[in-house]
Design a protein with these regions (language model features):
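SH3/SH3-like beta-barrel superfamily modules
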Residues: 198-241
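Bacterial N-terminal signal peptides that target proteins for export
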Residues: 1-9
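Boundary regions of SH3-family modules and the immediately adjacent low-complexity/disordered segments
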Residues: 109, 115-176, 225-268
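N-terminal signal peptide c-region/cleavage motif recognized by signal peptidases
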Residues: 17-20
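Short, charge-rich amphipathic alpha-helical segments embedded
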Residues: 75-93
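Short, low-complexity N-terminal intrinsically disordered segments enriched in polar/charged residues
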Residues: 24-57, 69, 105-106
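Short, well-ordered alpha-helical segments enriched in acidic and aromatic residues
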Residues: 63-74
Length: 268
């Protein structure tokens, strides 16, 4: 499911085409590659696993009632920007009306779209299913700094912030051009399938994008370019990179039972 803002490749294209994303300035310099890791601490609880499995089944059948029944009485919503995370962790959005958890899921789902729209009940239900679907689609789970240590789906990447920023500096691009490879990727000397391979980078590698959309030498293909650790420019097809923050559903224990206690919604 990629019907919301969680389609990272589309988001990357939007950001890289914006006035806030720039091609490399000056001559890029070599840098040390950096691969993110994922923490699974606290995720082996049998009752938590059972909750996640029930949510997956509800997503498959479109059972919004089960999804909403999983909400704690109080559900926090964290709104974060797509792109490289700020150093300061966000506070949850204010909830002066103290809306119940199931209604907060509606609020979170509405944040995944742009514009101030009065959605129908049917629309909101579908958006809630999509929200959970996008969060659980990756199949990973782990503690989240953004959600103050709560366990979330998907797992949040763990990395050295200073080392990541050093990569952007070496590449001569803003930190908003940093993305995470979702799979092992070969980068070529030119935007052509016949060009020599300059480097093969592992899944989870943080890469500095130079251009989000590059026309192939044959006029075909959806290429993109990055600054490689060698400081050379490498080209690859079909960007499916990930951002540092995805739409996430987070869990905690309330009165001894696992429940959905928070939602993280990234936006432009």
């Amino acid at each position: 499911m990629k019907t919301l803002l969680q389609a990272s490749a589309a988001c990357a294209a939007l950001l890289l085409a914006s006035p806030f994303a720039h091609a490399a300035e000056g001559e890029p310099k070599p840098y040390e590659p950096l691969v993110v890791t994922y923490d699974s601490t606290g995720t082996d609880d049998a009752e938590l696993k059972a909750l996640v499995e029930s949510l997956k089944k509800a997503i498959q059948s479109g059972d919004v009632a089960t999804l909403k029944a999983s909400a704690a009485p109080e559900v926090k919503i964290y709104s974060v920007m797509i792109g490289f995370p700020d150093a300061a962790l966000p506070d949850p959005l204010s909830d002066p009306e103290k809306r119940p958890g199931d209604q907060r899921l509606d609020d979170a789902a509405a944040l995944t779209t742009s514009g101030d729209v009065d959605y129908s009940r049917e629309d909101l239900d579908g958006m809630v299913v999509d929200l959970f679907g996008n969060a659980l689609d990756e199949g990973t789970i782990g503690p989240s700094k953004t959600a103050k240590g709560a366990i979330c789906s998907p797992a949040e990447p763990v990395f050295d912030r200073d080392k990541a920023l050093a990569i952007a500096d070496a590449a001569g691009v803003p930190s908003s051009n940093l993305w995470i490879l979702s799979e092992e990727t070969e980068f070529r000397e030119n935007p052509s399938a016949d060009a020599p391979v300059l480097a093969k980078l592992a899944a989870g590698t943080i890469v500095p994008f130079q251009e989000g959309s590059v026309e192939g030498e044959d006029g075909e293909g959806d290429w993109y370019s990055i600054v490689l650790p060698s400081a050379k420019i490498g080209y690859a097809l079909n960007d499916i990179s990930r951002g540092f923050q995805a739409t996430s559903v987070c869990y905690g224990k309330v009165d001894g039972k696992w429940a959905v206690t928070a939602v993280i919604v990234p936006g432009l």
